[in-house]
Amino acid sequence: MKITEKDFGQGYHLITLENKNKLVLSVSDLGARIVRLKTNDQELVLGFDTAEEYIEKDPYIGASIGRTAGRIENGRFSLNEKTYQLAIDPKTGHNLHGGSPGFELKKWSYVILNGENEASVIFTTTSPDGEHGFPGTLDVEVRYTLTQDNIWRVTTRGISDQDTLFNPTNHVYFNLTGDASQAIDQHELWLNSEAYAPLRADSIPIGVKENTAGNAFDFQTPKKLASVFASDLDQKELVDGIDHPFFLKESGLDKEAARLTSPDKKIQVDIATDASSMVIFTANFGPETPEMRGRKLAHHGGITFETQTAPGAERFSAFGSIHLKAGSTFETVTEFKIKTREE
């Protein structure tokens, strides 16, 4: 497989993998992030051209997120009968994505593995004991793999020397038009989910699983995202789109979890994961959006599939567990299969 490395600015690197079908994956040691995913020279994900732009404009785009993706209410959690206070995000009043700067702004070490059927970039970092208030020294590995059969695989591992919380994800945004100035409203979405987590006004889950049957968040039959944006569902109105955890009916790499199709039906992304839920966020940024590769990012200009345990699991056991025991290895895998259809 073809592999190139180049300078990404600010002391960071850009590593590009290209398979026999000309599917191109570019990743960086800035935040162990995906920067590009291209098929036939068409861009499939949002991103910037330099490390400096990520740092200045939006460090979460495409990045590895952790220690804990999403919000932890008031930055407080209890573990083994002890209460911990985490760093508070001033905008939300809660802990956001584990605290800032988090995984998204770390300079990760990396090695490259190249094989006949696939190539990988393996990023590693260590989050020290007490970072942003979390207990335990946590060693983290994020492995990005590109296969010859057009799968981008994300494998995340973690091991801590103390009991702690760990709920990582990847914050890639898809826009299959290749044009960040176009909204994703004409993309078609299917989800293997019949329940989601409603939110309070401050985007904290209220702690219940609500059935999606018959409402705007029901994607069990494929439909265009425009139908959601046009709906009057109160949860859609709350965030001006989608920014919610969806609980998967089935997990596993042999089970399709989600499917996103381009407006012209020529590109399809099939997603499989061993995670129990995914946070779907439709880039509800309003008019204040950055310029991205020469174009101003549209409101609703991308969509995330943040595979993880649902935020709030530290308080709501029905959501799952994000408790990582000392010495135990956490691992989660998500696969994105890129399918293209010619005229």
What are the residue ranges of the model-derived segments?
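An exposed, glycine/acidic-rich loop-and-rim segment of catalytic or binding clefts
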Residues: 1-343
